[in-house]
């Protein structure tokens, strides 16, 4: 028996087509989406966003602010065993600690990190390492079910990067527990300046120290800022020289091996290469980046790093330095470095005292008020 719905039937008035779903992202202009993507910055998160829709995929390459976090370090030997599916020993499975024990291993790691696929191989006998990011497309190495690829492979998908920050999983310099060592360097086609802050030990403030520090100003330095004789005889000066040379080697290696990225991404206004530990920071602004593209750098014949020019150095030292928050730096040392040919004002120390974030910024400001010692270093 057929059922006929008449126009007077109340059921008929309630039958209507289902409205189409509204995608509110379609109502947002591209400029707003790009603002969101630029605030995200992280290259992994942006990669996930790019697979959401064709529109997102077309906008991601226009992102100007990119942050690349390096997840792991895998030596070439380990990479070969991974690709061939051969069993690996426990020590080979954990190259991270061994690679970052000495200065030169991570320098090789940076070299492999910044090499593009298909580029010429390194000389035989060398055993460089790769800095890799997990996840994403076009991976090169699979480890433990996770696909890895180099940051340069990721960056080639971006066309308009202006602000790029790369973070290594650890500082290059192996230092003892409790030792403070931080450096910040600026480069053009060569080293423009470098500031190094070190201390043989750091004593954190106690609760009583914090209370006293909040209620009283920092006491004035009682000595005249002179370096004690024991500094020269107990190995203190030698240790500071090692810190200085090691920091300069690490900085010059980072600079040398950033060349491919700098050459390819001509829209860059700022490039920062740092590490999770906050040990070292290499910075380049737009003028410095352009200088490197125009003026070829001088490479060291001994290793893959930029040649460090002849240097003038100023050193400040305090056997014990108490900061406003109660922290005490034992054997506090500040070294300000510029090329010997630098024409900038010698007495200007503003770039030195502003090199580090707090609480170490105030340490630099306190140290530059002490007696200055001048040193020179040949090119290396």
UniProtKB/Swiss-Prot annotation:
SUPFAM superfamilies xref list: F-box domain
Q: Which Pfam families match?
A: F-box-like (PF12937)
**Entry-linked InterPro entries:** AUF1-like, F-box-like_dom_sf, F-box_dom
Q: What top-level branch of life does the organism fall under?
A: Eukaryota
Which residue ranges does the record assign to the F-box domain?
Answer: 22-70
Residue intervals passing through the bilayer: none
**Could you identify this protein by its name?**
F-box protein At4g18380
């Amino acid at each position: 028996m057929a059922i006929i719905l008449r126009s007077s039937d109340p059921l008929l008035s309630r039958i209507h087509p289902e409205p189409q779903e509204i995608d509110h992202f379609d109502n947002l202009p591209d400029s707003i989406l790009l603002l969101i993507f630029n605030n995200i910055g992280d290259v992994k998160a942006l990669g996930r966003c790019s697979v959401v829709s064709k529109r997102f995929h077309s906008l991601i390459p226009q992102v100007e602010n990119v942050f690349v976090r390096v997840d792991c370090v895998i030596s070439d030997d380990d990479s070969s065993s991974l690709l061939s599916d051969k069993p690996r020993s426990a020590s080979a499975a954990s190259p991270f600690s061994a690679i970052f024990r000495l200065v030169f291993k991570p320098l090789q790691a940076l070299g492999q990190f910044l090499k593009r696929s298909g580029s010429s191989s390194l000389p035989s006998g060398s055993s460089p390492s790769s800095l890799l990011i997990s996840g994403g497309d076009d991976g090169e190495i699979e480890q433990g079910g996770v696909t890895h690829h180099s940051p340069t492979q990721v960056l080639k998908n971006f066309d308009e990067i202006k602000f790029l920050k790369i973070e290594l999983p650890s500082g290059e310099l192996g230092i003892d527990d409790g030792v403070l060592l931080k450096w910040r360097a600026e480069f053009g086609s060569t080293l423009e300046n470098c500031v190094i802050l070190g201390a043989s030990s750091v004593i954190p403030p106690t609760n009583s120290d914090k209370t006293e520090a909040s209620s009283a100003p920092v006491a004035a330095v009682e000595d005249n800022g002179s370096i004690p004789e024991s500094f020269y005889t107990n190995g203190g000066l030698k240790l500071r020289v090692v810190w200085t040379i090691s920091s300069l080697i690490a900085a010059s290696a980072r600079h040398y091996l950033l060349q491919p990225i700098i050459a390819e991404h001509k829209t860059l206004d700022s490039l920062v290469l740092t590490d999770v530990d906050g040990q070292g920071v290499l910075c380049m602004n737009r003028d410095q980046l352009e200088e490197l593209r125009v003026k070829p750098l001088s490479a060291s014949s001994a290793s893959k790093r930029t040649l460090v020019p002849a240097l003038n150095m100023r050193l400040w030292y305090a056997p014990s330095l108490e900061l406003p928050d109660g922290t005490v730096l034992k054997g506090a040392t500040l070294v300000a470095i510029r090329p010997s040919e630098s024409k900038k004002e010698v007495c200007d120390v503003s770039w030195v005292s502003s090199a580090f974030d707090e609480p170490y910024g105030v340490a630099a400001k306190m140290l530059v008020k002490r007696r200055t010692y001048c040193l020179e270093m040949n090119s290396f």
